[in-house]
């Protein structure tokens, strides 16, 4: 499956200072693979066998650095940094998702929420552009990205193209757009890192 814009935006994540050797980078990128089976399982369940599960691991890396105990200042929790209200809404459909603090259920709920956003944007956006809209909505809320799309249309731009959302982002009120645009790019960089360290064969 094409990942569209995301696989084209290869943004370096490392800042200045000493750089890790290629061997160290491989170890670092693969050090926390304990949740890989869970990412694989729920990626397949909610997006199908052909979908690249690295996307969701890369998202969790951006959200929590794969720390199941992560807490944000706004109250988001766990690997996928879910708000308790979002998790509770998902629990009404999946009561077996017992606890937001259980890594498996946190991942499962995060990917299930991604699927909701994927389908939401699928009504008007093709697969090649849909991933950044999904991720942007996960970060900022679908209403915010919807307002950005409306601003793009008002500017006579194609609102189904993520670069046009980036273009109008500064004009969208009540949106910390730099955080959202950086979030999408960071996930793309994480995917590149994961793929570069994927074993051959």
Residue ranges and their predicted role:
Residues 68-69, 147:
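Short, hydrophobic secondary-structure boundary micro-motifs
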Residues 70-90, 153-156:
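Short, surface-exposed glycine/acidic/tryptophan-bearing loops
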């Amino acid at each position: 499956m094409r990942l569209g814009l995301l696989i084209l935006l290869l943004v370096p994540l490392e800042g200045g200072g000493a750089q890790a050797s290629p061997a160290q980078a491989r170890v670092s990128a693969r050090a926390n693979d304990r949740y890989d089976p869970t990412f694989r399982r729920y990626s397949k369940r909610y997006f199908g066998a052909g979908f690249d599960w690295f996307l969701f691991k890369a998202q969790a890396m951006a959200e929590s650095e794969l720390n199941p105990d992560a807490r944000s200042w706004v109250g988001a929790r766990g690997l996928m940094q879910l708000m308790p209200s979002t998790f509770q809404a998902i629990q009404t459909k999946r009561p077996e998702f017992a606890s937001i603090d259980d890594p498996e259920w946190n991942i499962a709920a995060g990917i299930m929420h991604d699927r909701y956003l994927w389908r939401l944007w699928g009504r008007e956006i093709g697969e090649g552009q849909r991933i950044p809209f999904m991720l942007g909505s996960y970060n900022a809320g679908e209403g915010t990205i919807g307002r950005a799309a409306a601003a793009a249309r008002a500017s006579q731009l194609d609102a189904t193209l993520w670069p046009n959302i980036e273009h109008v982002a500064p004009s969208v009120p009540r949106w910390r757009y730099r955080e959202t645009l950086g979030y999408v790019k960071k996930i793309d960089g994480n995917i590149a890192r994961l793929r570069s360290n994927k074993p051959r064969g």
